[in-house]
Amino acid sequence: MKYGIVSIVGKPNVGKSTLLNNIFEREVVISSNKPQTTRNMIEISYDSIEDCVINFIDTPGLHNPKNKLDLFLNSQVKASLKKSDLVLFLFDLSRDFDSEDEECLKVLKDFNCNNVVLVLNKRDLKSEEEIKNAKQSISKMFDFTNVLEINSKSKEDVSVLLNTIKEHIKEYEGEKKDLELLKKEVSDKFFVSELIREIIINSFRQEIPYGVAILIDEMKYEQDKNLLTIVYSIIVEKESQKPIIIGKGGSMIKKINISLRERLSDIYDCKIFTNSYVKVKKDWRNNETQIKELGYKK
């Protein structure tokens, strides 16, 4: 039996969360075409390969920090590297290699990561010659354990990736019952809060999504009614953002709740009731106490 902790690392909006969802063939983490969607170091176990358990860590994209929340996000990436047995450095072939990619490799070097697989994603969008050139140029910058070219939407390519991971992690030497204790799951409450944030990210433009956090005030299931009740607060950092989130006549907050109920109906086989509030915590992204209160803890 093999076991390993595997971090997926790369610059913002490179497709780390999408890759993880494609591995699990369902949505286990939120994803968006906007950068900095992932805020937490999310660890979740995959055990669908024979004689192997992989604890994947989806990390925030490494980027130049603009506030204390950004510093926290970068610290999450570095914390994941400390505990990882293998790192996947994800590169999007449809984008140029830039300073953010360089910074990721620098961090990997600084942490003496010696078991790193370069994963070149979106190979379907490039010619063989272009892929070869990208592979050669990036491989000169770091001593990778292996290099893979994939299309993360391809089940065959994902299978190749999983088997490669299995090759590069160690045998588990403990008792099988102890291995069960090492498995990780995303809690329902955390997943719902992230789902709400994803809906908001995809519903608004510019800075508003990045100044939003979600607090689940109540989440309970009443078996006799087959009813799941979710009460939550949308936290914004400026008074001017509150009416934008609410919308004219409550139109936007209504849209958010309708989308949430529709998404949850695909997951939970029950009736769903949601109630939401919009609250202001001024400049919370620069307030360490509020950052912790909102669930972003090291």
Curated annotation (Swiss-Prot):
UniProt region (G5), positions on chain: 150-152
Keyword Transferase in annotation: no
Domain of life assignment: Bacteria
Database matches in Pfam families: KH_2, MMR_HSR1
Family the entry assigns: Belongs to the TRAFAC class TrmE-Era-EngA-EngB-Septin-like GTPase superfamily. Era GTPase family.
PANTHER family (alphabetical): GTPASE ERA, GTPASE ERA, MITOCHONDRIAL
Name under which the protein is recorded: GTPase Era
Gene (name only): era
